[in-house]
């Protein structure tokens, strides 16, 4: 937890999910301060205030009095925003949380954007704004200086209107954009589509899906050794576009599939890919936006497939992967298996062996390893995820 003065208000802010030994990582950054210093709150006239990509709810807390709409593709960011509102005794009911797939309110007065990591997501958001902004809408964006590129400015210019950037302050920069009645090139397609090699499938990806334009090389390696003829329920945890679950669905005709991700666009892409490629199997599928396997019944899964991330936005961390492993252990039946693919340097083997009491390398190459851990009766009571671990992340 860290305390920060934003404008004239002091806030206690935490990253989410909470992490042990994370004192060096703050829930806010200089770009948040810089944005708030440059917003003229006197201009807000009761019309909607929109905040985009507010990772931990910092801007939403600071603008709470103006009943903001907080727009994000990340369910984790929504949980973080709600957490920090509660932490500061702010009324959650006056904040509207919107996903990246939701319609935006008309004629906003103020739009505050934290520049996202994916340029495609920024383009999607700017095009969505173009449909609702008014001529007097104030648009201001911010990010670390290293994340503001010519391509970023060109997107604002092309879609919304005249754009200028500020000098750097504490290694952060701002973008000011005026709404102009400019001709817009043809509408961008809602998804990027490409054929999946060695299959008859076509993969559809929304803007914020990892490896949007081609098959992730880790997923490609993983797909080569997915199991056949599993009975019971299989979870594609951190499913992305659902390509791993799609192949698992084909190879396991008696199984049910659960597609889970914290990205709204990822889950929407997964559902689109099953609908388009295997509509006959939709009745065997469930699609869920969630923080890991929260809400999934204990000991209800036979197999968990996972290609875990090793970063949270720009911060490199395997904490999210660890939470996924713990959730998998909690939700697997005794005898159920967790199969993961990961970069060799991440040393997931020893983490899984410590958590499950066993781990097997199924395949490896110069970059990736595919590992399997089995939930045994003896490991059943030794920790298990979702905040109730006997074994903590710091043990590793």
Curated annotation (Swiss-Prot):
Keywords: Cytoplasm, Methyltransferase, rRNA processing, S-adenosyl-L-methionine, Transferase
Coiled coil: none
Enzyme Commission no: 2.1.1.174
One Pfam match: MTS
Enzyme class name: transferase
Transport as UniProt keyword: no
InterPro entries attached to this UniProt entry: DNA_methylase_N6_adenine_CS, rRNA_m2G-MeTrfase_RlmG, RsmC/RlmG, SAM-dependent_MTases_sf, Small_mtfrase_dom
Domain of life of the native organism: Bacteria
UniProt keyword Repeat, yes or no: no
Annotated compartments: Cytoplasm
An MF annotation (GO) of this entry: 23S rRNA (guanine(1835)-N(2))-methyltransferase activity
SUPFAM superfamilies linked to this entry: S-adenosyl-L-methionine-dependent methyltransferases
Catalytic activity: guanosine(1835) in 23S rRNA + S-adenosyl-L-methionine = N(2)-methylguanosine(1835) in 23S rRNA + S-adenosyl-L-homocysteine + H(+)
GO CC term, one of those recorded: cytoplasm
Known function: Specifically methylates the guanine in position 1835 (m2G1835) of 23S rRNA.
Family note: Belongs to the methyltransferase superfamily. RlmG family.
Entry protein name: Ribosomal RNA large subunit methyltransferase G
